[in-house]
Amino acid sequence: MADASAGGLYQCLTDISRADTSGDYQKALTSANKLIRKYPKETFAFKCKLVAQIQLSQYADALELIRKTPAHQMGHVGFEKAYIHYRQDELDEAIKELNTCDKDDVKALELKAQVFYKQENYQQAYDIYLYLLKNHSDDSDELRRANFLAVQARLEAQGVKQAVAETEDSYSQLYNRACVEIEAEKLPQALESLEKALKTCRKSFEDEDREEDEIEEELDSIRVQKAYVLQRMGQKAEALAIYEKVQAANHPDSSVKATITNNIPAASSDFALPESRKRFKAALQIDQTKLTRRQRLTLMLNNALVLLLSNQREPCKRALEELVAKFGSSKDVALIEATLHFKMGDAEAALKVLAGSDLEQSLARLHVLLNAGRLPEAVGAIRDLPISGKLGASSLLTSTLIAADSRDEAVKELVAASTAKNQTPEALKSILEDLVEVEQQRGNETAATKHLEKLVEKFPEDLQLQCRLVGAYSKTDPKKAESLSAKLFPETMEVDVNVDELEDSDWILYGEKYRQKKEAKSPQTAEIAATRKLKIATKRKRKIRLPKNYNSAVTPDPERWLPRQERSTYKRKRKNREREIGRGTQGSSSANPNVEYVTASPNSPRPLPGPVAEGPRQQRPNFQKQKKKKNASKF
């Protein structure tokens, strides 16, 4: 054995072992290079160098080392090559390399399960983890169990029901269990699991003497998931507070950043579109390899939606094209694209995009037809809806038929709806009232009266309906109208009402508020009223004052109340006699004997064109303005 101080084999191996224990892989790489130079035939040295390069993320150098090193010196490196491809997001190449490994190699099986999970082949990942949990047990059982729960959460999201065992101990397992419960719509249970995960995470990290920053970073991931659950449960204010707190902490995890950016606009009722555009633009520049396919798709969809709401039409169009290129078309993409076309005034293009047969696209297509005024096509679209038998669809169809001036068809639809089974009383009342209105619009008072009779029969306590029936009878059968009116409003009613008190009450004229104010101003109890002396209200009689020159023998002038200028005995001054010419009622002429009317001579000049008449107006005398007196100078 060579001397240790001279950098012999023993010293190099010791340095590699220490570096691996301390996590100093740069030192391990240096020791491996030294070992290869001194002992080029040592197979173990090449493997150590390869592992050190992988740990230092020197993937290109690691692949170059595998390519240059002969297979008999390097040994089998299928797992290492697969891991490099996995970290470089070359998942298909990773699967090829893993297929060359031993079928019972636990490391290769776990890596294959992770690759399947990233490829979203969740059922294959589920089978591998289930096999490992049943047939292998080592120090990685806790991590294996957490990964298994993560796969179960994804399967639950795809609609594959999962049974979760109550064996979670670590915070990772509790967190992933909560994810399964979220996908199963068990939100209260998920919230409880996340609360346990927060406590367990802090305790386990404190037991390991981790720094507070590291603990908070891990807790923030759980808090964001908790905020999502609160948001789904309708507690948006609490969820928004958590999102903003985590966002202020500047979390380094790309998945957490993307989740916060995506969820804040949905949780906030008054979010600003310009600010949201900036956040989505920043979120799309995050390392996309660390996000799941579902997260990337949701992020790009919401980005396109925010651009659409901001009226950024060209950027929205480009965002949709990029989305379709990466993930293909979908129902949500079609809805956003159709809305964009409709906003740009191209209803035909919007209808071409909405070619799907699902309910959402059918309703969107109907919305476009109605807004474009294509009522006959809209009627056909309503009838093709899978929910055409529902009350809302029937009401919309009737309104559309009436707007299209097809009242006969509208009546048929309403009659069919009124005879349908399992109708609630409120729905039946609404349908019959619509029938009455349509029949009255058609001028068919007899049919309207029949429908009103049905309404009164179904709802005999509704006085308003009975009054409407009286009005209908007055047009078709006056005798029935009189009979029903006498029944509803008899001449003598045995009601305990004090008519005199009602007539003397002011609150009937001025409303209930006047009554309440009057009672509040003078609260009197029965005891005080009984002991107090009642004052008899006496009218104050004012003494009659007569004019000084009053003569009782002379009859008073009947025009004494008229203004002086309007009395028959009034004589105008000469200069004011011509003022009243042309005055009086609109359209009438006044004949004043003092005015001479002279016809214009044929040779008289043509008058200049006057202003255009603006219609009749109330005329007023033009009084001369009084001249302002000059102010005397002050000393």
From Swiss-Prot:
Transmembrane segments annotated in the record for this chain: none
Q: Which InterPro entries match?
A: Signal_recog_part_SRP72_RNA-bd, SRP72, SRP72_TPR-like, TPR-like_helical_dom_sf, TPR_rpt
TPR repeat residue intervals: 7-42, 75-105, 106-139, 171-204, 220-253, 255-290, 436-469
Q: What is the lineage of its organism?
A: Eukaryota, Metazoa, Ecdysozoa, Nematoda, Chromadorea
What compartments host this protein? Cytoplasm; Endoplasmic reticulum
Q: Record's GO cellular component, any one? A: endoplasmic reticulum
Give the protein's recorded name: Signal recognition particle subunit SRP72
Repeat among the record's keywords?
yes
Key word Cytoplasm present: yes
Please give one Gene Ontology molecular function term for this protein. 7S RNA binding
Family membership:
Belongs to the SRP72 family.
Matches recorded under Gene3D superfamilies: Tetratricopeptide repeat domain
Q: Which residues form a coiled coil?
A: none
